[in-house]
């Protein structure tokens, strides 16, 4: 048994119809700043999937520094979901787009990039790539992060991160379990509205916690944000 730690799981509760509306952008950015101020006493503050509603590279100058400042001042960490554009230094010189979780605060510069992408939403199957190029659908050409990503060191823990429905594929997550002390899922189920998707996804996370023998933390946009113990029991939950 290791040392206890404290984690703040932020549920942003942003409607999907407003999330990408530029008229609301400044409000969402300001609310994130307010959350990090309120949760600075926690060793780790976790935001949900794509909590930053624009590319990291397009954020206002100094925004990430302001976002991490309250936690960093106390030697604490922040993990936030974001869309990241990386230029791969390979012969093709293609841009790599990742649905990622990036670390800020005391241990910045760490990243987990989603590996199991959703076909037709996050990547184009080979025989349909022509259609996506024609339709110019945004964010449909994402790059997998790789299936051997190491746990992130955050809040005094080794955190095995997964994003959205990656936790439905236990065989793809199990490689990180021996090195980790906790599992962490970042999700945005606002796409599914008020449906069975939220309780179903929580049950999937419970199965992964029990299977791995590790606590599972869930930070979601509209629910269900939760702490699940290694026995698969939900000990704390937001609606």
Model-derived segments and spans:
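Enzyme catalytic cores with a strong preference for nitrogen-chemistry domains
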Residues: 1-239
């Amino acid at each position: 048994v290791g040392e206890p730690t404290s984690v703040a799981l932020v549920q942003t509760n942003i409607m999907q119809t407003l999330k990408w509306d530029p008229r609301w952008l400044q409000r969402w950015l300001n609310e994130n700043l307010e959350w990090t101020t309120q949760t600075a006493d926690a060793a780790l503050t976790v935001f949900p999937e794509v909590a930053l509603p624009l590319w990291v590279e397009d954020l206002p100058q100094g925004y990430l520094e302001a976002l991490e400042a309250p936690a960093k001042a106390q030697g604490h960490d922040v993990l936030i979901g974001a869309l990241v554009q990386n230029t791969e230094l390979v012969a093709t010189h293609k841009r790599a787009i990742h649905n990622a979780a990036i670390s800020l605060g005391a241990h910045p510069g760490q990243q987990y990039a989603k590996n199991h992408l959703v076909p037709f939403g996050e990547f184009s199957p080979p025989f349909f790539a022509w259609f996506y190029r024609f339709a110019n659908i945004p964010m449909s050409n994402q790059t997998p992060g790789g299936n051997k990503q190491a746990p992130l060191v955050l809040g005094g823990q080794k955190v095995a991160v997964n994003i959205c429905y990656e936790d439905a594929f236990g065989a793809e997550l199990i490689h990180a379990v021996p090195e980790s002390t906790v599992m962490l899922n970042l999700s945005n189920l606002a796409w599914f509205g008020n449906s069975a998707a939220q309780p179903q996804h929580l049950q999937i996370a419970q199965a992964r916690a029990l299977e791995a023998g590790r606590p599972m933390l869930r930070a979601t946009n509209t629910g269900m944000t939760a702490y699940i113990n290694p026995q698969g029991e939900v000990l704390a939950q937001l609606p």
